[in-house]
C-alpha cells in the first residue's frame, strides 16, 4: 500500500473512532475556563463527558499524539498527527487536555531529560494526572529573564531553593513547577542557571493569587523559603538550564501561535453567509480574512515542523505570536461588523453560538 493510501485509510479510521468516542458535549465551542480540562491530581471536571473524553483520548495516546508510545504518546507521524487534528476540527472536537506539561515541559523533557525523568513524568502528563506551572518571571526579571535571582544551593544530598517568582499562571492549582534557579551566582547571567522540577506541595512553597481588574486571578506570586529538592530533579546539566529554558520557550510560542485564531477553524464567510448577500464590502473583507487565516495556518504548520527539526529562525516564534494576535483581533472586528452589538453575547444567533 502506498503512503497516500495508508494515510487515507488512517483518516477513515480516525474519523470513525472520533464519531464513536467523542461525546456530543465535547463538540461545542469552549466558552469559558470551566470548559477546559486541565487534569492534575486534584482535577475537577465540569461534567462526566469532559472526564470521559480526556480518558478515551489518553488511552489512545492522542492527548500527545506525536510523543513516543513508551512515554504515553500515540507514536503518530507528523502527517498522521495533522490528520488527527483535521478530523477533530471537522467535528468541532475540543482539546481533551490543556496542559503546560504537554505544550512546554514535555518537549523539553524529550530533548534534555534523563530516561528516568521521561519515564516518571511524561506518562503522567499524557494521562492528565499531573498539572504543571512555569516558574520563570521574577519581580526583577521579566523581559530580561536571565537576571533571575532565585537561589539554589547545593547541600550535598539535596538542593535548597529560596526566592520569588511572579505572574506564575495557575500556580495555586498546579501540582508541580518547572523552575529556573540560579545555581552559580558568580557566573555571567546567562550561565549558572539550572532548570529544576519540584512538587508545589513541598514545605516552603506558597502562592498568592494576583487579582486582575477583570476580577479573575489566573496569575500568582510564588514564594520559596528553604525548599528542599532532590538532586535528580535537574533537567539537563547543572548551570546550563538556559539552553533548556530557550528550547521550552520556543514550544510555548508554538502553543501561542496555535491559538492565533482564537481556536476557530471554520470560515467566517461561511458562518456569516446569510448576512453577506447584500453587503459586498463586508463580504470582501471576510473573504480576505479567510485567505489570511488559511495562510496563517499553513505558516504555523511550517513553523512547527521547522521548530521540531531544530531549523526555526530565532525570530520566528515572536513573528508567529504577533501575526496570530493581529489576525485574531481582525476576526473579532469582523464578527462585530457582521453581528453588531448582538455579537457581544456569546450565545446569540449573531455570534453564531460562539462558533465564528
Segments from the language model and where they lie:
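Buried hydrophobic positions in well-ordered alpha/beta secondary-structure cores of metabolic enzymes
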Residues: 7, 18, 61, 68, ...
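Cytochrome P450 C-terminal beta-domain/meander region
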Residues: 144-162, 348-355
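Amphipathic, small/basic residue-rich leader segments at the start of a protein or domain
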Residues: 1-99, 120-127, 257, 279-287, ...
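A short, Trp-centered hydrophobic/proline-enriched beta-strand micro-motif
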Residues: 128-136, 180
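A short core secondary-structure module
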Residues: 149, 157-158, 162-208
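N-terminal glycine-rich flavin-associated loop
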Residues: 97-116, 142
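Glycine-rich beta->alpha junctions and the first turn(s) of the following alpha-helix
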Residues: 5, 204-298
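C-terminal helix-coil-helix/basic helical segment that borders enzyme active sites and/or dimer interfaces
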Residues: 28-32, 280-283, 294-355
Amino acid at each position: 500500500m502506498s503512503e497516500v493510501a495508508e494515510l487515507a485509510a488512517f483518516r477513515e479510521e480516525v474519523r470513525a473512532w472520533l464519531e464513536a468516542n467523542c461525546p456530543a458535549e465535547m463538540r461545542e465551542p469552549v466558552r469559558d475556563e470551566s470548559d477546559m480540562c486541565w487534569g492534575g491530581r486534584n482535577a475537577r471536571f465540569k461534567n462526566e463527558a469532559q472526564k470521559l473524553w480526556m480518558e478515551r483520548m489518553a488511552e489512545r495516546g492522542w492527548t500527545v499524539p506525536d510523543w513516543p508510545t513508551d512515554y504515553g504518546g500515540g507514536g503518530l507521524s507528523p502527517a498522521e498527527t495533522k490528520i488527527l487534528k483535521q478530523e477533530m476540527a471537522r467535528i468541532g472536537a475540543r482539546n481533551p487536555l490543556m496542559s503546560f506539561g504537554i505544550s512546554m515541559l514535555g518537549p523539553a523533557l524529550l530533548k534534555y531529560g534523563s530516561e528516568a525523568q521521561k519515564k516518571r513524568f511524561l506518562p503522567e502528563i499524557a494521562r492528565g494526572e499531573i498539572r504543571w506551572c512555569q516558574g520563570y518571571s521574577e519581580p526583577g526579571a521579566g523581559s530580561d529573564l536571565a537576571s533571575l535571582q532565585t537561589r539554589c544551593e547545593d547541600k550535598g544530598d539535596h538542593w535548597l531553593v529560596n526566592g520569588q517568582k511572579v505572574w506564575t499562571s495557575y500556580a495555586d492549582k498546579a501540582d508541580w513547577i518547572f523552575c529556573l534557579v540560579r545555581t552559580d551566582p558568580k557566573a555571567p547571567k546567562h550561565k549558572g542557571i539550572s532548570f529544576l522540577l519540584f512538587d508545589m506541595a513541598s514545605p516552603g512553597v506558597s502562592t498568592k493569587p494576583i487579582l486582575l481588574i477583570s476580577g479573575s486571578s489566573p496569575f500568582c506570586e510564588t514564594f520559596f523559603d528553604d525548599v528542599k529538592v532532590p538532586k535528580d530533579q535537574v533537567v539537563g546539566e547543572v548551570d546550563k538550564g538556559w539552553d533548556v529554558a530557550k528550547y521550552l520557550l520556543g514550544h510555548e510560542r508554538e502553543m501561542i501561535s496555535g491559538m492565533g485564531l482564537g481556536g476557530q477553524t471554520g470560515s467566517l464567510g461561511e458562518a456569516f453567509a446569510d448576512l453577506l448577500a447584500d453587503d459586498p464590502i463586508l463580504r470582501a473583507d471576510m473573504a480576505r480574512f479567510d485567505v489570511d487565516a488559511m495562510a496563517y495556518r499553513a505558516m504555523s504548520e511550517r513553523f512547527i515542523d521547522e521548530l521540531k527539526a531544530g531549523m526555526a529562525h530565532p525570530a520566528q516564534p515572536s513573528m508567529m505570536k504577533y501575526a496570530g494576535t493581529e489576525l485574531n483581533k481582525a476576526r473579532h472586528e469582523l464578527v462585530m461588523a457582521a453581528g453588531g452589538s448582538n455579537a457581544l453575547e456569546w450565545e446569540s444567533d449573531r455570534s453564531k453560538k460562539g462558533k465564528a
